[in-house]
Curated annotation (Swiss-Prot):
Natural source organism: Halorubrum lacusprofundi (strain ATCC 49239 / DSM 5036 / JCM 8891 / ACAM 34)
Protein's name according to its UniProt entry: Probable glycine cleavage system H protein
Stretches that traverse the bilayer: none
PROSITE patterns in UniProt: BIOTINYL_LIPOYL, LIPOYL
Domain (Lipoyl-binding): residue spans on this chain: 24-106
CDD domains: GCS_H (cd06848)
Lineage, opening ranks: Archaea, Methanobacteriati, Methanobacteriota, Stenosarchaea group, Halobacteria
């Protein structure tokens, strides 16, 4: 099975993605992750103004199969949360790189997680 892996973002081995460039970045979970999770039924996220730390858990996604921690690909301040997910968590499954995004973060300089993968490296990992 082939999964979508956009090349305009970086990935953690734990299957979170982060957009690159700009004053703020967007974070979500990969197509592979949403497929492995199955139907997402609940998402727990931090609030705007909270700080997240690269490589550490910042939230939880719950599916019919499992409860999984979400890990931060960057350190910074949460500036927006996708509140649509509280009513429609299935957006994580339906559009993991679009409407199913999780957070927008203002990253701190040098705050990337260790071992962020580019699209080719991540694609090799999930192959």
């Amino acid at each position: 099975m082939s999964f979508e892996v956009p090349d305009d973002r970086r990935y953690l081995e734990s299957h979170e993605w982060v957009t690159t460039g700009g004053d703020t970045v967007r974070i979500g979970v990969s197509d592979f992750a949403q497929d492995e999770l199955g139907d997402v039924v609940f998402v727990e996220l931090p609030e705007a103004g909270d700080e997240i730390t690269a490589g550490e858990a910042f939230g939880v996604v719950e599916s019919i199969k499992a409860v999984s921690d979400l890990y931060a690909p960057v350190s910074g301040e949460v500036v927006a949360v996708n509140e649509e997910l509280f009513d429609r968590p299935e957006l994580v499954n339906e559009d993991p790189y679009g409407d199913g995004w999780l957070l927008e973060v203002e990253p701190v300089e040098g705050g990337d997680a260790e071992g962020l993968l580019d699209a080719d490296e991540y694609d090799d990992q999930i192959a």
